Amino acid sequence: MKPYCMISNAKTFAFSAENPTGARAGGSKGGDCTKLSPTVAIRAGETVTLVDTDGPGMIQSIWFTGYVGHSFVIRMYWDNCEYPSVEAPISAFFGTAYDENFVDRDGKYAVLNSAQILVAPGRGLNCYWEMPFKKHCRITMENRGEKDQSLYYIITGCHCEVPDEIGYFHASYRQEHPVQKGRSYTIIDGIQGKGQFVGVTLATGMNGNNTCWVEGEARMYIDDDKYPSIHYTGTEDYFCGSYGFGNDVQIKSYQTYSGLYSGMYAIYGDNRAFYNEQQRFLLYRFHIADPIHFEIGFRMTLDNMGWTGPRYDDYTCLLYTSD
């Protein structure tokens, strides 16, 4: 049975600019058709707390708009831990690392329409990852830019029982600009203990005219593997595509797609279709139906290759684990 079909003792909460404490009946007292506090202002260099609540419970959905650029860094702390379990630019967390431009090469708003993340027209960023906590939850936003900015937000969840065996949600940001030519790009390493790898978003920026860029193979090393246990033959194959993301192999043109768990949803740059133009791509793969389980550790790499050999493109990723 789905959670919405089950009657339980869970208590819903929602933190927003209109209800910053998340208290029951703590929203606007202004009455119908009024806006008292639709946004929170975050000064340059300032960090504000968006959620601060005791557990046990679970974050269930997040919505942001307003300024959602790279200068905002989101952090999430579970159970009074000193270090964040989530730390990333807000744009990268929602799979849109090239936040200076939300319009794709065809002049349309690039929509990411997946089960876990929705990027909607008008810079509406939505997240549906479940994030459990046992003792405490704190979510902050830091403005690392030079200008004051405003953020619209609502973060919903519930206070509920959390099983002992449930994993904590983690998300980490990595970038390599450019990838060292001839070396694999590391998506994730240094993970220790028992858990699950549940997904990644990837932004790629082309740095050379070297035909198709998606020949790089994805390799997953489970526990103490010397060689990969899971090995995809190409970048497009790992992101559930094929043949260079082409809608016509003969004319070598790309076609975007956005599915429930995977996609290559945006292409930024000029509208010339051929593989060898210098463009930027946004991709995602969520392992909801097929999480990658590990007992003592996990590592994943992705080659940066084209048809004629290694490349030196810009790679940025945001990886998600539950452990």
What are these regions (language model features)?
Residues 1-117, 121:
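An N-terminus-focused feature that recognizes amino-terminal "leader" regions
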Residues 320-323:
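Conserved small/polar residues in nucleotide/adenosyl-binding loops
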